[in-house]
């Protein structure tokens, strides 16, 4: 099972025929189901087997069996869960189909000899994950529904998709001034050590409640005492609102909350801060702040990060444009 998951994880790094029956009431054979059309993209069909045999679907089924048992997918609840997962994976297959079509249009598909060579290289990289143990590699292929041939075809598609993405994003550039601007606006991200703050808060539902709390605190009432009385954060209420040490870059907290907390000086108490959870009164018990690294020492890392973000933005915009211009039809009834 671990070997299968390992292969699926590698394969899932990628971007991720028509059947005739006299009547819908007639039960299709497994072969007919596999060949049934689940989508058409500019006239090209995506068959159910393309979805069922995909690494993403194999990974989903493996996870479902591990968590819920072998029989879960046969239940009504299981079928509904699997159908929803299939709909999401189908959307990815449609995106891949559009990209493969654009590969032909943009003339970025390598010649067969070169494409085979690149695919073989990727196969060898996957084998290296298994320490080049051919038997273990073949056993894992079998358990994930692949043969050597179908794996290679899958990888060839991923190579083409990668080349299309590279073509779309090749002109993306980031100037030094862009990096400098980002550095100036986010200096707390570039300290010698991560800046941290010890934080307490009081959470209430309404702004009026928050103003009343702030008034009590301005009158020098004890923060922890007030938190225990009125805070609606069950995780910190009994600790006097204490959240503990938080890194400035911690993404587990609401961005608005973090921005307000970082702006406060040590010992300060905020005005009401509104987030998706309600209204907070934030207290900074202490801070540990470190010197900021010089711009030149982090410039290239910033440019690399900004370039990746711009490339992702350019790719997302282009694929949405291509899909909107494509003729796409789905057949959800054939998913199960």
Curated annotation (Swiss-Prot):
Membrane topology: Lipid-anchor
InterPro entries per the UniProt record, alphabetical: Foldase_PrsA (IPR023059), PPIase_dom_sf (IPR046357), PPIase_PpiC (IPR000297), PPIase_PpiC_CS (IPR023058), PrsA_foldase (IPR050245), Trigger_fact/SurA_dom_sf (IPR027304)
Residues annotated as domain PpiC: 194-286
Stretches of the chain forming a coiled coil according to its record: none
E.C. number: 5.2.1.8
Chain residues carrying a lipid of type N-palmitoyl cysteine: 23
GO biological process, one term: protein folding
One GO MF term: peptidyl-prolyl cis-trans isomerase activity
Record-linked PROSITE patterns: PPIC_PPIASE_1 (PS01096), PPIC_PPIASE_2 (PS50198), PROKAR_LIPOPROTEIN (PS51257)
Signal peptide: 1-22
Principal location class: membrane
Record's GO cellular component terms: plasma membrane
Family membership noted in the UniProt record: Belongs to the PrsA family.
PANTHER family: FOLDASE PROTEIN PRSA (PTHR47245:SF1), PEPTIDYLPROLYL ISOMERASE (PTHR47245)
Role, per record: Plays a major role in protein secretion by helping the post-translocational extracellular folding of several secreted proteins.
Protein name: Foldase protein PrsA
Naturally occurring in which organism (per UniProt): Clostridium botulinum (strain Kyoto / Type A2)
Gene transcribed to yield this protein: prsA
């Amino acid at each position: 099972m671990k070997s299968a998951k390992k292969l699926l994880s590698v394969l899932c790094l990628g971007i991720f025929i028509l059947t005739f029956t006299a009547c819908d009431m007639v039960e299709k054979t497994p072969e007919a189901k596999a060949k049934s059309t689940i989508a058409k993209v500019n006239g090209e069909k995506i068959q159910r087997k393309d979805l069922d045999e995909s690494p993403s679907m194999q990974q989903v089924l493996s996870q479902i069996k591990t968590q819920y048992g072998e029989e879960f997918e046969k239940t009504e609840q299981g079928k509904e869960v699997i159908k929803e997962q299939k709909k999401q994976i189908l959307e990815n297959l449609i995106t891949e189909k559009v990209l493969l079509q654009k590969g032909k249009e943009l003339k970025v598909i390598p010649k067969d000899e070169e494409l085979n060579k690149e695919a073989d290289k990727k196969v060898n990289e996957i084998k290296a994950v298994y320490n080049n143990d051919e038997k273990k590699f073949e056993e894992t292929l079998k358990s994930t529904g692949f043969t050597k041939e179908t794996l290679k075809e899958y990888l060839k598609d991923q190579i083409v998709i990668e080349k299309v993405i590279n073509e779309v994003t090749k002109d993306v550039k980031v100037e030094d001034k862009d990096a400098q601007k980002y550095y100036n606006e986010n200096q707390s991200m570039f300290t010698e050590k991560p800046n941290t703050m010890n934080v307490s808060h009081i959470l209430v539902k309404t702004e009026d409640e928050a103003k009343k709390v702030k008034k009590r605190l301005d009158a020098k009432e004890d923060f922890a005492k007030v938190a225990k009385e009125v805070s609606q954060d069950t995780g910190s209420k009994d600790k006097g609102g204490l959240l503990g040490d938080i890194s400035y870059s911690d993404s587990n907290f609401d961005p608005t909350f973090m921005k307000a907390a970082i702006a406060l000086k040590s010992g300060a108490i905020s005005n009401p801060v509104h987030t998706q959870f309600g209204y907070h009164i934030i207290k900074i018990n202490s801070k540990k702040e470190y010197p900021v690294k010089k711009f030149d020492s982090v410039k290239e890392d910033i440019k690399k990060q900004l370039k990746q973000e711009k490339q992702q933005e350019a790719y997302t915009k282009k694929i949405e444009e291509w899909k909107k211009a494509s003729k796409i039809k789905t057949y959800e009834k054939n998913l199960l």
